[in-house]
Design a protein with these regions (language model features):
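Amphipathic alpha-helical "coupling" segments that flank catalytic cores
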Residues: 1-388
Length: 388
C-alpha cells in the first residue's frame, strides 16, 4: 500500500480496513457489542483486560453475537467466563435484571464476512461448546463426591508445597492449628474455622481446578456449598483465605475468612523465613512481601486485636510459632530457627514494617514523620487498627 506522506497514512490504511488507533478499535468493539446485546435485552459483562487484549489482536473489528447451549448454564459462572475469556477471547453476556449469564457470547472478528458473520459465529459456538463440554464433565465428576474426601487428602499429602516445608497437607495442618488459636483475637467460631481449614486446599486436586487453575478457591467455595452443605461463612472462607491478593484487592469481612487468611499468610511467612528464603531486593519468588502486607491489611481493616510483637515475645501465644517451627525443623537441622520466639517479630519487622511505612506515608503522614513514629513502635498492627 503506497503512502505518499504522513498526513494520509491513517486514511490510506482505513481505506484498506486497518484502524491504526487502538482507542478507536476499543470504542468500536464496546459500541457494537453493547448495541447487539441491547437488541436482545441483554448487557455486556465488562472486562477491561480482555478489551485491551482483543483490541490489540484485530485491525478492523467486527463484533458478532454468538449462541451457546443453555445446558451449559448449569456450570458455575466463573468456569464459563474463564473458558470464554482465556481460551477463546469471547466476552460474556448477562441478563441485566438477574445478573445471571445468558446463553450467548460476543466474539470480535477481523473481517466483514459476506454472510454477515453467521458462519464465523457458528464456528466459534462449536469451539466454545467443545470447551464447555469438557468443563461440564469435570464439574460433574467433582460434584459427585463431597469436597473433603480421604482420597483428596491423600493427593494433597503427595503434592510438595516446598521441599523444605513439606506437602500441601502439611501446610493445611499448620494453618488449622494457627487459625484455631487466632480465634480468640478475631472472634471467629473455632469449629467453623477448623472446618474451613480442612477444606481450604481441597479444590486444588479437583478436576475443574486442574483444567482451570485460576479458579482455585472459587471452585472450592462452590463445591463446599453444593456437596458439603456448609454454611456460607465456611464456603466463603475457602475462597477468601487467599485474599487480599494485592493492594487493590478486597479484604475479607467474615471472621472465619479473616482468621483463615491470617493463618495462611502467617504460616507462609514463618515457614519461608525459617528456611532462609527471604525476599532480596526486587526478588520475591514466594510473594512474601504481599503476604506481609496482606496480614497488615487484614488486621487493620478488620480491627483485629493481635499484638504480634508483645504476645509472641512475651510467650502469650503458647505454641503458635513453636508448632510451625517444630513442624518445619523436623525436616531441617535444629539451628534453622534460633530462638523460635524471636522469629515472628523479626518477620513482621522486616517484611511488614517497610510495607506499613509506605502505606502509612501515602495516606496520613509525610515519610519523615512516619519513620520517626515507627522507629520505636513495637506493636504496628494494634497502632494502625486504632488510627486507620
Amino acid at each position: 500500500l503506497p503512502v505518499t506522506s504522513a498526513a494520509d497514512h491513517a486514511s490510506k490504511l482505513r481505506g484498506a480496513k486497518v484502524l491504526i488507533e487502538r482507542e478507536e478499535r476499543k470504542t468500536i468493539i464496546l459500541e457494537q457489542a453493547s448495541r447487539l446485546c441491547a437488541a436482545k435485552g441483554l448487557e455486556l459483562v465488562e472486562d477491561i483486560g480482555l478489551l485491551e487484549e482483543v483490541a490489540g489482536l484485530v485491525e478492523w473489528p467486527v463484533v458478532l453475537l454468538g449462541d451457546m447451549d443453555r445446558d451449559f448454564l448449569t456450570l458455575p459462572g466463573e468456569v464459563i467466563r474463564l473458558s470464554m475469556r482465556t481460551h477463546q477471547k469471547y466476552f460474556a453476556v448477562r441478563d441485566p435484571k438477574t445478573k445471571s449469564l445468558a446463553p450467548h457470547f460476543i466474539v470480535v472478528a477481523n473481517i466483514e464476512a459476506k454472510d454477515g458473520g453467521k458462519a464465523i459465529a457458528a464456528g466459534n459456538a462449536r469451539v466454545l461448546s467443545a470447551r464447555l463440554s469438557d468443563a461440564q464433565f469435570f464439574w460433574k465428576v467433582d460434584t459427585a463426591t463431597p469436597l473433603y474426601t480421604e482420597e483428596r487428602k491423600a493427593k494433597l499429602a503427595k503434592i510438595v508445597f516446598h521441599q523444605k516445608l513439606g506437602s500441601v497437607w502439611d501446610k493445611v495442618e499448620r494453618v488449622r492449628a494457627l487459625a484455631e488459636e487466632l480465634c480468640a483475637a478475631t472472634g471467629a467460631d473455632q469449629k467453623l474455622v477448623r472446618e474451613a481449614a480442612n477444606l481450604c486446599k481441597m479444590d486444588l486436586v479437583t478436576e475443574t481446578v486442574g483444567e482451570f487453575p485460576e479458579l482455585q478457591g472459587q471452585v472450592g467455595r462452590q463445591l463446599s456449598a453444593l456437596t458439603n452443605g456448609n454454611r456460607e461463612s465456611v464456603a466463603a472462607a475457602i475462597e477468601d483465605h487467599y485474599r487480599p491478593l494485592g493492594p487493590n484487592d478486597r479484604v475479607p469481612t467474615d471472621p472465619v475468612a479473616v482468621t483463615l487468611a491470617l493463618a495462611d499468610k502467617l504460616d507462609t511467612l514463618v515457614g519461608f523465613w525459617a528456611i532462609d528464603e527471604k525476599p532480596t531486593g526486587s526478588s520475591d519468588p514466594y510473594a512474601l512481601r504481599r503476604a506481609a502486607l496482606g496480614m497488615v491489611r487484614l488486621i487493620t481493616s478488620r480491627g483485629v486485636r493481635v499484638n504480634l510483637f508483645e504476645d509472641v515475645e512475651g510467650g502469650h501465644w503458647p505454641g503458635v510459632v513453636s508448632r510451625v517451627a517444630r513442624s518445619i525443623t523436623e525436616r531441617r537441622a535444629a539451628e534453622t530457627i534460633e530462638p523460635e520466639r524471636a522469629l515472628l517479630p523479626a518477620i513482621v519487622r522486616h517484611a511488614g514494617q517497610e510495607r506499613v511505612r509506605a502505606a502509612l506515608a501515602s495516606i496520613i503522614a509525610p515519610a519523615d514523620i512516619t519513620d520517626a513514629v515507627l522507629t520505636n513502635l513495637r506493636d504496628l498492627p494494634a497502632f494502625l487498627a486504632d488510627r486507620l
